[in-house]
């Protein structure tokens, strides 16, 4: 079930935009342009319509959000029993391609994180073919004519 509309914040790159819920889930993204079909459309129904959630694995006691001054860089801070972690979301102005960047930054203590990526093209109607599920390298999700390359990494503090 989607979050109430007032719980969403906007990130964008002037050619596309995403809605990020207070729980760390991107529930809406038409990509690579505003007029493209959505690849995350949980806002229309449920997570099975596509979403990308990054959040603490433990119950959250407090959430605060803010935009960095004069930007669409969104910072969501989660407080849990064992610590504090920030999720920083943005879409940089594009060069050759569009990007969604999600950074997790530990602030205090140790916080176990969980990630769920459910790509669904055409507003949740098309389940893409994923060519790799390797945890340490890139993965590609394809459904002609759409495709998404997912890369990730863990940086030491």
Please give the residue ranges for each predicted region.
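Beta-sandwich/jelly-roll carbohydrate-recognition scaffolds of carbohydrate-active enzymes
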Residues: 2-157
């Amino acid at each position: 079930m989607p979050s109430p509309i007032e719980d969403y914040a906007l990130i964008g790159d002037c050619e596309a935009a995403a809605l990020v819920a207070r729980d760390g889930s991107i529930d809406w993204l038409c990509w690579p342009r505003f007029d493209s079909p959505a690849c995350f459309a949980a806002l229309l129904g449920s997570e099975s319509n596509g979403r990308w959630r990054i959040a603490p694995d433990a119950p959250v006691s407090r959430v605060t959000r803010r935009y960095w001054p004069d930007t669409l860089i969104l910072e969501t801070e989660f407080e849990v029993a064992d610590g504090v972690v920030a999720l920083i979301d943005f879409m940089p102005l594009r060069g050759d391609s569009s990007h969604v960047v999600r950074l997790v930054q530990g602030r205090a203590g140790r916080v176990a994180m969980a990630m769920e990526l459910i790509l669904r093209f055409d507003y949740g109607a098309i389940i893409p073919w994923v060519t790799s599920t390797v945890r340490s390298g890139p993965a590609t999700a394809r459904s002609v004519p759409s495709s998404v390359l997912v890369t990730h990494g863990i940086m030491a503090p």
